[in-house]
């Protein structure tokens, strides 16, 4: 009978209404954490995009409990769709709980995903690291200085979203590096302009 109740929640997860999906996975987190998380991870291979995206959101609601299982799946899977979904679930966790500490194995899995054979996974990883925040700064800075302009551009935009006093100074230093790709440099200039504009809009202490 109890498992039937969980099965009903998984049926609700496939509902097209995002509110019903949210109610379902929040009930899973509250009442069925041990049983629901492995099933949600199993749905990351789901060809139904609506259900797969709902599963990513659901995993994100589990917070710290999802970090190590996601690392294991991300490193083990040969399916690029599953790997991309793992990365997106990491972004959900970080978005839901700003400042949450990612354990070393989770950061290592994300670091390895930066050089994934799938460009979709690699770029999604950069965006996820932007959600992780200050803890991900060293990895993002390495990407900006790397030889993949598409990833570097995504990394600049991710860095610009992190609230850390060293970001602006670091981007200005990178802007003056001669080896930086011209498109990446333009992105840095745009990011710095946005950051300056944001600072100008903030109320000054009286």
Where on the chain are the PLM-derived regions?
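Structural detector for internal amphipathic alpha-helices that build alpha-solenoid repeat scaffolds
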Residues: 1-3, 11, 19-33, 38, ...
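Alpha-solenoid HEAT/Armadillo-like helical repeat scaffolds in large eukaryotic proteins
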Residues: 8-12, 16, 39-47, 69-78, ...
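Core helices of alpha-solenoid repeat scaffolds
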Residues: 5-6, 37, 67, 103-107, ...
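Short acidic DE-rich linear segments
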Residues: 202-206
